[in-house]
Each structure stands twice: as C-alpha cells, then as structure tokens.
Swiss-Prot record:
Any one Gene Ontology cellular component term annotated for this protein: cytosol
InterPro entries named in the record: Asp_de-COase-like_dom_sf, Asp_decarbox
Subcellular location per the Swiss-Prot or TrEMBL entry: Cytoplasm
Organism of derivation: Geobacter sp. (strain M21)
Family: Belongs to the PanD family.
Record-listed E.C. numbers: 4.1.1.11
The protein's name: Aspartate 1-decarboxylase
Domain of life: Bacteria
Binding site for substrate: 57, 73-75
Length: 134
C-alpha cells in the first residue's frame, strides 16, 4: 500500500509579489527551496493563511538570499503581497518507508529568512521562535 506523505513545507512565508501576467508558478528564494528539498518544476500546494485560499502550482527558482515568494499567473488573483502562506509538497511512498519518513520543515521570519528546520511540534503557537500575526 502507498501513502501520500508531506515531503516539504515552508511555514508562514510572506508573499513578496503577485505577477498576474507571468505564465504560472511560484517563485521561491533558492535558499528556501534547497532547505525544504523542493526542486524546480515540482508541484507545490499553496495555502494562504491570510485569506484562506488554497491552490496548486509548481516551483521555480528565485534569487538566492532575496526572500522572494512571488505567486505568478492566474493564481496571483488569489493572494496579495504581505499575505502569509504555507508552501507544501507531497510524495507517495510505500507504507514501510512512510512509517519512518520525516518531512523537511522550514520556518521563516517575516523577511522569508530561514529561522530553523526541525520537526513539527504540536502547539506551535507557544514556541518563541515562531512569530504569529493575526
């Protein structure tokens, strides 16, 4: 039996741009792509924490160290600069592999600089390293 598992997550990144006239995708700072094990053209889910929209697109490389998180193409109508988003990718794997699987989770600050990469912890709102905005 195969299971669909979370492979990668960039948690609460800040949208820096929305380019309606680009052909599609999400541009992600290359540092964040590497830290989260997301490769160019990989399918990703985008969950907008600010407005609740959810959609799927694919990742393309942004300038390393720039903090860029730019939603491109038609999906640009679903977000606004400064929205907080979660970027996730998934992988299918056999049950035995899934049991031991640990996803790459990347937590960022409000400039999309990596704060840490670690396991997800229940009750994250109490962690000092995570800055929650309402």
């Amino acid at each position: 039996m195969e299971r669909k598992m979370l492979k990668s997550k960039i948690h609460r990144a800040t949208v820096t741009g929305a380019d309606l006239h680009y052909e599609g995708s999400i541009t992600i700072d290359l540092d964040l792509m590497e830290a989260s094990d997301i490769i160019p053209y990989e399918a990703v889910c985008i969950w907008d924490v600010t407005n609740g929209s959810r959609f799927e697109t694919y990742a393309i490389e942004g300038e390393r160290g720039s903090g860029v998180i730019c939603i491109n193409g038609a999906a640009a109508r679903l977000v606004a600069p400064q929205d907080l988003v979660i970027i996730a990718s998934f992988v299918n794997m056999e049950n035995a592999e899934a049991i031991a699987h640990e996803p790459k989770l990347v937590f960022v600050d409000d400039k999309n600089r990596m704060l840490e990469s670690r396991k997800e912890v229940a009750g994250q709102a109490t962690l000092k390293s995570v800055h929650w905005k309402n």
